[in-house]
């Protein structure tokens, strides 16, 4: 997979650029990895993901949420939590759009916040269940 990183310092921040490079390489074994966090930060517009050719080239989707009330330019991996109603990135909306457009692949949670890392097993199971239930309703 090729994963565009939406950070301003990233040399590859756009899924569109990644897909163009994959196409021009002629190597059919590559897919783009869409990360809801990096898609929110990067230059790609939601309309980009309405193209069946794009959807067919997505290999995996990483999902996380950001509940923090900070400037978008200050978002960091440490702010990534399990997606829920307070997610300012609206990751569930992007997931629902991808599925409406035909994505049938896998999702992978990527919450890096210390809040999630410090959860006990029972608390984490409940938090994951709540997040999955929230995402299923999108």
Please state what every model-predicted region is.
Residues 12-138:
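Histidine-acidic metal/acid-base catalytic patches
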């Amino acid at each position: 997979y090729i994963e565009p990183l939406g950070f301003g310092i990233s040399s590859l921040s756009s899924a569109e650029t990644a897909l163009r490079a994959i196409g021009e390489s002629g190597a059919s074994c590559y897919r783009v990895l869409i990360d809801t966090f990096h898609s929110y930060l990067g230059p790609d517009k939601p309309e980009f993901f309405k193209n069946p050719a794009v959807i067919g080239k997505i290999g995996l989707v990483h999902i996380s949420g950001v509940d923090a009330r900070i400037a978008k330019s200050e978002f960091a991996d440490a702010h990534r939590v399990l997606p829920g109603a307070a997610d300012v990135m609206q990751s569930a909306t992007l997931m629902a759009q991808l599925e409406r457009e035909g994505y049938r692949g896998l999702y992978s949670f990527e919450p890096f916040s210390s809040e999630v890392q410090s959860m006990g097993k029972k608390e984490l199971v409940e938090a994951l269940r709540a997040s999955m239930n929230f995402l299923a309703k999108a």
